[in-house]
Curated annotation (Swiss-Prot):
Residues 29-95 are annotated as: Disordered. Pfam families: MatK_N (PF01824). Belongs to the intron maturase 2 family. MatK subfamily. Keywords: Chloroplast, mRNA processing, Plastid, RNA-binding, tRNA processing. This is Probable maturase K.
Length: 534
């Protein structure tokens, strides 16, 4: 198994970790399994537990027992191997006395010039990626716990790197959905660029010699065979940002475009203001995954403590993100957009707790913003021609008999023909999720007109009738002036369905709705004359 961790020799942990739990609970059992790459897949191994014949044949993965408590303790005596300088800490970590897959702790001090953290690396042979529907990966129950370990931080670990996963080894359904649309796109679960600021971390002087002068933080990229351009090039481009440089083990590619360099520079500069004090120790990904094919969509992902930012450019990328977001939130309801996040200075982007994507048609800038922080950056980029589709949402409502194919609501009798109350709630949930297809950053007035009738969230002959009557868009009841009102502040706790910001004679539309009943409550409050937006 390729999994690396610091030895912790002479290391005092005085800082307090800002932890961000993922959406999976940590397994209570102590005999959690760790997934590893088997160097001899054809041989029978008693340690390969839970891997059946077909899966074992096609995946070349082995399951090795590793107690969770042992990973958390990270005993220094269990580290018995050092990575060589010539391999940049990625290869050459095998002890002749023990097989490669038996390792769980390997120090990278010699490779990067300082103590690092645990890096679970789940490898897969470089082959043509097989469809996920071929195999069911339910036997790999420990992959979510691996992410949690890297997030929470064992008490003896100092810093944390990313995680390498093959395309076909991730068992989570919510991750399969976006990967069908964006191949191995980064998410809060997946490999990420992780930034942590530590005070009194006790970094040795030799580590500071390899990093920018006067800095004491770090930025580490993930290693993933299927990363897109920003994930694998951002670290090299950080050398163009102020007060940062690339270590001697690599250099910036000569054919790197100026726009990508600017994006990386702005991200590095902006995050350095948040992480105090700033530091950029850059570790390069393997050269064998660079460069990536030209013309691939670009998704910029950055993270700082509990702040996430995903900025996407190119029409196909932005379009796919908008299709993915409601599905992601359906499986992870806790990752909801913050109400009232949009403001006039950020009208060119669509933002939520999970992603930031520029989607204004014919836009010449990609604007990125950290969630919960006033940071706003911009850099020249490609054109974004991402118009929000409405046909799919209207089609879903038509299938459920809530409206016609033209977008008009159906009669009450048609809406009340439902066999069970569960069908009512399920269909209402599907509709609230499908509204994101139409409302999220919709710029076309015709599309908004077709979505003016928000379907009833209740039916006359079911207990769900208590939610109220038919909800229509605010324009029908309050006129077009409501769309030019400024978004509410988070303290007000209101949920707007559609937000429009006027700029240079053009209105940009946004949606910040998570549930239909939230919009209904907001509309009820807006019925009062003194609260009506003008």
């Amino acid at each position: 198994m390729k999994a690396w961790a610091s030895t912790g020799r002479g290391l005092r942990i005085n800082n307090v970790w800002c932890q961000q739990r993922l959406l999976h609970p940590l397994p209570s059992r102590d005999d959690t399994h760790a997934i590893a790459f088997s160097s001899s897949p054809g041989k029978s191994d008693p340690e390969q537990e839970g891997v059946t014949g077909p899966n074992k044949k096609h995946s070349d993965l082995a399951t090795i027992k590793q107690p969770t408590s042992g990973i958390r303790r990270q005993d220094a005596s269990s580290s018995s191997c050092f990575a060589g300088r010539g391999s940049s800490g990625l290869e050459g970590c095998r002890d002749r006395r023990r097989p490669l897959r038996s390792y769980t702790n390997i120090s990278l001090e010699l490779a990067v010039g300082g103590p690092l953290t645990m890096v679970p690396q789940i490898c897969h042979p470089v082959k043509a990626r097989q469809p996920l529907v071929v195999h069911e990966w339910n036997i790999f129950r420990s992959i979510p716990s691996t992410f949690i370990l890297t997030e929470e931080g064992p008490p003896r670990c100092h810093r944390f790197l990313g995680t390498e996963l093959s395309y076909s080894s991730h068992p989570e359904i919510p991750i399969r959905i976006p990967r069908c649309r964006i191949r191995d796109a980064p998410l809060p679960h997946s490999p990420r660029i992780t930034l942590h600021g530590h005070r009194n971390s006790g970094v040795p002087q030799r580590s500071a010699a390899r990093s920018p002068a006067g800095t004491n933080g770090f930025i580490i990229p993930p290693w993933n065979h299927y990363m897109y351009e920003p994930e694998c090039r951002l670290t090299r481009l950080c050398g163009q940002a102020p007060h940062s440089r690339v270590p001697p083990c690599g250099a910036c590619a000569p054919n790197t475009t100026r726009s990508t360099r600017g994006v990386a520079g702005h991200i590095a500069k902006g995050l350095s203001r948040i992480v105090e004090p700033p530091l950029w120790i850059v570790i390069l990904p393997p050269k064998r995954i660079l460069p990536l094919p030209k013309g691939e969509p670009s998704i910029h992902y950055a993270r700082c403590v509990n702040h996430f930012m995903i900025a996407s450019k190119a029409a196909t990328s932005a379009e796919k993100w908008k299709h993915h977001h409601p599905r992601f939130r359906r499986y992870h309801p806790s990752a909801r957009a913050r109400s009232g996040f949009m403001d006039q200075s950020f009208e060119d982007c669509s933002a939520s707790l999970c992603y930031v994507s520029g989607t204004r048609p014919e836009i010449r800038k990609v604007r990125a913003r950290m969630v919960g922080d006033p940071l706003l950056t911009g850099t020249p980029s490609e054109e974004l021609l991402a118009a929000t589709p409405t046909t799919h949402s209207i089609g879903l409502s038509a299938e459920d008999k809530y409206r016609s194919t033209a977008g008009r609501p159906t009669s009450r009798s048609a809406r009340t023909i439902l066999p069970r109350d569960d069908d009512v709630s399920n269909r209402s949930y599907r509709i609230s999720a499908s509204i994101h297809y139409c409302g999220e950053c919709s710029k076309e007035r015709n599309g908004l007109y077709r979505m003016q009738h928000i379907p009833r969230s209740s039916c006359a002959k079911t207990p769900a009738r208590k939610h109220g009557g038919t909800i229509r868009v605010a324009r029908d009841e309050y006129g077009p002036g409501v769309f030019r009102a400024p978004p509410p502040t988070p303290a007000e706790g209101r949920a707007l369905l559609l937000i429009g910001v006027r700029r240079q004679g053009r209105t940009n539309w946004y949606s910040d709705m998570t549930r239909v009943d939230c919009v209904a409550n907001h509309l009820r409050r807006e019925r009062a004359p003194h609260t009506r937006c003008r």
